[in-house]
Amino acid sequence: MREIISDGNELVAKAAIEVGCRFFGGYPITPSSDIMHAMSVALPKCGGHFIQMEDEISGISVSLGASMSGTKSMTASSGPGISLKVEQIGYSFMAEIPLVIADVMRSGPSTGMPTRVAQGDVNFLKHPIHGDFKAVALAPASLEEAYTETVRAFNLAEMLMTPVFLLMDETVGHMYGKVQIPNLEEVQKMTINRKEFVGDKKDYKPYGVAQDEPAVLNPFFKGYRYHVSGLHHGPIGFPTEDAKIGGDLIDRLFHKIESKQDIINENEEMDLEDAEIVIIAYGSVSLAVKEALKDYNKESKQKVGFFRPKTLWPSPAKRLKEIGDKYEKILVIELNKGQYLEEIERAMQRKVHFLGQANGRTISPKQIIAKLKEL
């Protein structure tokens, strides 16, 4: 392990470089701009390319173009910028172009409070586009995870050939401190790169794969010809209105993610064995939860356990159902008006308790303890 001092946004950039990202296209927006700035410094030093575009739409567009050339690529923004990127997010999903999209969440809606924290993009990124969509979204909760979840985001994007969201709230992005991260050799060993077709060019059908597998898009300029389209398409990418081909395509885009959910989903569980109450939280809120439980579990007769999904989408619905069936008192805590609460209650098929706020401020351990005493 290496010990460094950094903030969350710069750790995202460091992880991206070390896992092989060599292109960043974007447009500055608070509170994600530090990622962009760090990439502008680091990429030229390692043979990569950085470009600040005229707006958020062109920022994601050039990143997709770079990815189609075979280069690991990313962009970063916050809620208002992500709203502008949604057309190309849909294109990335449909054409199976891998891309990491960092969303450092700030208070909204609209322009909201640019320098304040929120978790208001959670439901938005579950389904940001028109048409059907299967999201992959990771939620770092610490400086260490700002690094490790970025590595995981790139690996999942390359493995699944799909856009992957790094859904990080402002507090994690701007917290600063000493952190231990994996050695570069460890990162290189765990790095996943997209598959390439090796064979006769006339046999190359990038979208002609099994129903639980992603497309195999060879990088441009290697002599393999295919068509890239946001339209429904057949095995070599040319548009079609055939009902079976179109239906099979959408089924495959879903199933390639659903079939890998055991790999995609990661959770943290604490003190669930004898718990009478279970708290569910994610992102920076989990830090306040852990601080609150240090004292509460020593003083209270009611033991409190903690469940944290690191992967928000696809949701850990099966595990949530198990928790809902086993524990009577469940408290969901979020920096919004109950966005992930909706998914938790859907998975558990029951109502649970909630503590949330959308005022640009963090939830304190004192607020959490006060809520626990009400249950």
Task: Give names to the regions the model predicted.
Residues 1-127, 134, 151, 170, ...:
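Thiamine diphosphate
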Residues 7-11, 257-277, 290:
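Glycine-/acidic-rich phosphate or pyrophosphate-binding loops and their flanking alpha/beta elements
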Residues 40-45, 251-259, 291-306, 349-351:
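Short helix-loop-beta junction
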Residues 116-170, 194-195:
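Conserved thiamine diphosphate
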Residues 164-268:
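Conformationally flexible catalytic loops at phosphate/diphosphate-handling active centers
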Residues 286-322:
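Generic long, charged, amphipathic alpha-helical segments
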Residues 328, 334-375:
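Peripheral docking tails and interdomain loops at the edges
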